[in-house]
Amino acid sequence: MSRRCELTAKGAQVGHKVSHSNIKTKRRFLPNLVNVTFLSDTLGRAVRLRVSTNALKSVDHRGGLDAYLLKAREAELSPKAVELKRAIAKKMAGEPVAAAS
């Protein structure tokens, strides 16, 4: 399982740990990821995603998962999130949606 947010595509970054004597050693800055169950009002079901706490704050600010996904670019979403976005858009357009596995 990769350390990447499924909504914002935030991943691990590489930098230096700097000691008091200014010796630099490589280290990784990992994103703060949490497993969250969102409720989709449009689809009427729960969706489980692994997201960063920053994305969690953004989803809350936008007014829910549906609003966040519809506004987000597909390039920065995971394949699972893109599938959800398309299902939400299709449902809002009035077309029947097949159940996602």
Curated annotation (Swiss-Prot):
Coiled-coil regions in this chain? none
Record-level GO cellular component terms: cytosolic large ribosomal subunit
Q: Which InterPro entries match?
A: Ribosomal_bL28 (IPR026569), Ribosomal_bL28/bL31-like_sf (IPR034704), Ribosomal_bL28_bact-type (IPR001383), Ribosomal_bL28_sf (IPR037147)
**Classification via Pfam families:** Ribosomal_L28
Q: Name one GO molecular function term.
A: structural constituent of ribosome
Among the GO biological process terms of this entry, one is: translation
The protein's UniProt keywords, in alphabetical order, are: Ribonucleoprotein, Ribosomal protein
User: The organism sits in which domain of life?
Assistant: Bacteria
Q: What additional remark is attached to this entry?
A: The initiator methionine may be removed.
What does the similarity note say?
Belongs to the bacterial ribosomal protein bL28 family.
Q: Which HAMAP family match?
A: Ribosomal_bL28
By what name is this protein known? Large ribosomal subunit protein bL28
Traced from the root, the source organism's taxonomic lineage reads:
Bacteria, Pseudomonadati, Pseudomonadota, Alphaproteobacteria, Hyphomicrobiales
The gene is rpmB
